[in-house]
Amino acid sequence: VAATTDDEKQDEAPAPAPAPRRRGRGPIATAVSVFGELLITAGLVLGLFVVYSLWWTNVIADREAHKQGNRVRDHWAAGPGSIDTKDGIGFLHVPAMGNGEVLVKAGTSHKILNDGVAGYYKDPIKSALPEDKEGNFTLAAHRDGHGAKFHKIDKIDKGDAIVFESRDKWYIYKVYAKLPETSKYNVKVLNPVPKESGAKKPGRYITLTTCTPVYTSRYRYVVWGELERIEKVDGKRTPPAELK
């Protein structure tokens, strides 16, 4: 009997079955895949936009506000001049918000407020200025993005101090009322005598306004204060007790 060699065994082994041919993806699967990729891309773009809106605009605005604030202080150091300067009229200090000093400029347009400052209203109801004998010093600032100078306005309570620093004087106001939510069209809160705050007669008031709820501009948050006293600025610009 002849021996069987390995080659003969291999010749007698069955051949492997051909690999099944892969079927291409159908139109529905392709569409779902493309849609998923678009969603991922949109999510990334949205995430970058949020970072830009809520962080990077703050960085840019704070730099610009600091630069403009330095110009105001340089102007003051140069000698006597009008309270209103090209770059701002002074600085707002609200200890309850914990954000240091906020430059105040004329106007409340986005072009003004986007520089990380507060602005006093020129319309629809013209703001009084701190040195006026009576009236309402009305201010607005962003709550989110672009410096977010009034982001913590909800931390202000009745009895808290609001201080405005001009070249020659410190104006110290005391908070007596707040309105956590009102229509963005409610301009009565800016009246010279803001009756919605409970005020009944002419005086020297201050009003802070910003958007609410946070990250929206649907409504307005309002805080009112009334002037308690005025202190002259000394040579060292020693702040009042409320800021120490």
Question: Over which residues does each language-model region extend?
Answer:
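Solvent-exposed, non-transmembrane regions of membrane-associated and secreted proteins
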Residues: 27-157, 165-244
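Terminal targeting segments of Actinobacterial cell-envelope proteins
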Residues: 1-32
